[in-house]
Structures are given as structure tokens and as C-alpha cells.
Design a protein with these regions (language model features):
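Short pocket-lining segment of the protein kinase catalytic domain that shapes the ATP-binding cleft
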Residues: 133
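Glycine-rich phosphate-binding loop signature in dinucleotide/nucleotide-binding domains
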Residues: 13-19, 87-88, 124-126
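Acidic/histidine-enriched active-site and ligand-binding environments that engage anionic O-linkages
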Residues: 86-94, 154
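Conserved N-proximal alpha/beta basic substrate-recognition cap immediately N-terminal to
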Residues: 2-75, 79
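Glycine-rich phosphate-binding loop of ATP-grasp-fold ATP-dependent ligases
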Residues: 75, 91-120, 130, 140-144, ...
Length: 208
């Protein structure tokens, strides 16, 4: 058994077994390891280690997009409760910066609700950091996309249905085809293209 976030152990296993390609199809958590090992051993890979890490850490992705990026939202990274006292962009989503599967995610309407849920979110943050993101009202969607030479060549937009009884937007199902108009879908594809360019993802699959 090898821990998938232990890049050194994975690299040794790859070398010892003459493996030609390292990839993960089921875990976001493994993608920085995939990129780091592939770079170290000169194996084929879609994105750099820096890009994989940025995509894996919510605060790094927000920073990489930049405050002037059309489609980004107001956000703040906090490590202690006092850091959130001047946050004003409510309602907001409170998330551990480095968790997956909606663990530790809560919608908050005030600083009082941040206090109520702070420790619950922090339980799932390995780095001890939480991000507050201004909440966007509306129908949720997902996008499965593939990019080649910096251009999106495939993008499938689906409607996302979340469990109402759980916090954090845990996905219940995806619906196809999307209910949105062709015009809206084209705007979504444009946003996806711009995000991929900002994150320097030039080849391979991506999911939003």
C-alpha cells in the first residue's frame, strides 16, 4: 500500500516497476502527486505540478484567477475567527481550502454563523486554512471539458441537483441535456476557456 499523496513513495514504486504513465481518474487529491512524479521522472503529463496544486487548493485558484477576472467572486482566506470579522460579502460559502467531496462546507449568512461552523470546517482543513467565498444564487451546473493545444474541443454542460438536507451542495445527480439556452451554454464555454487559460491548462480533461 502507498499513500497517494506521498510523491516520493509513488516515484520509487514507478521506478521499481518500470511504469510508463502515472494518472488518477478517481481522485482530485492524487493529481498533484501525478504531476510531481511525472515531472521528476520525465513521464508524459497534462499539467505542471504548480498548476495541479493550484487546482487542488481553493484559495490558490481564486488568487490565480485574480480579482479582476470576470467570473471570480469576492473571497477571504482565514486561519482564525478574528480574520473573518471584517468579511462583508454575505451570504457566503465557508470551505476548507484543501478538502474534497464537500467535506466541511457550510453556507453562512453572518459572522455569528461563521463562529457556529468554524470548528466543523477546520476539522477538514489539513493546512489550517478556510476560504470564505461570496455565494452566487442560481441553478448549479457542472461542466466536463477537454482541451487540446489550449483550445476547448469538448464541453458538456449538465444541470446539477444537490441534496437539500445536507450542507455544502453535495451532488445528488446530474441532468442532461441542460435546461439552459444555447446562448447561456456559449457563455459558460467562454468562461471555461478563460479559466483554463488563466490556470495554464493547455491539454487534457477538466471538470468544473
Amino acid at each position: 500500500q502507498i499513500n497517494i499523496i506521498d510523491a516520493e513513495a509513488v516515484a520509487e514504486y514507478v521506478k521499481d516497476n518500470g511504469i510508463d504513465l502515472v494518472y488518477s481518474v478517481g481522485s482530485d487529491l492524487a493529481m498533484p502527486t501525478v504531476a510531481k512524479v511525472s515531472e521528476k521522472l520525465g513521464l508524459p503529463h497534462f499539467v505542471s505540478y504548480d498548476t495541479a496544486l493550484t487546482c487542488n487548493l481553493k484559495h490558490k485558484m481564486r488568487v490565480a484567477l485574480g480579482n479582476d477576472f470576470k467570473g471570480n467572486v469576492p473571497f477571504k482566506v482565514i486561519e482564525k475567527l478574528e480574520d473573518a470579522e471584517d468579511f462583508e460579502c454575505y451570504p457566503a460559502m465557508m470551505k476548507p481550502v484543501d478538502s474534497q467531496g464537500q467535506r466541511g462546507v457550510h453556507k453562512v449568512e453572518s459572522f455569528e454563523e461563521i463562529k457556529e461552523n468554524f470548528e466543523k470546517s477546520m476539522l477538514y482543513s489539513k493546512s489550517g486554512k478556510i476560504i470564505l467565498e461570496s455565494y452566487l444564487e442560481g441553478q448549479e451546473i457542472s461542466v466536463n471539458t477537454y482541451v487540446k493545444n489550449g483550445k476547448v474541443i469538448f464541453a458538456l454542460v449538465s444541470d446539477r441537483v444537490s441534496f437539500k438536507e445536507f450542507p455544502g451542495g453535495i451532488i445528488k445527480k446530474h441532468l442532461l441535456p441542460t435546461q439552459f439556452s444555447k446562448n447561456v451554454v456559449e457563455k459558460v464555454k467562454d468562461l471555461v476557456q478563460r479559466v483554463l487559460q488563466k490556470l495554464e491548462i493547455k491539454d487534457g480533461p477538466a471538470y468544473f
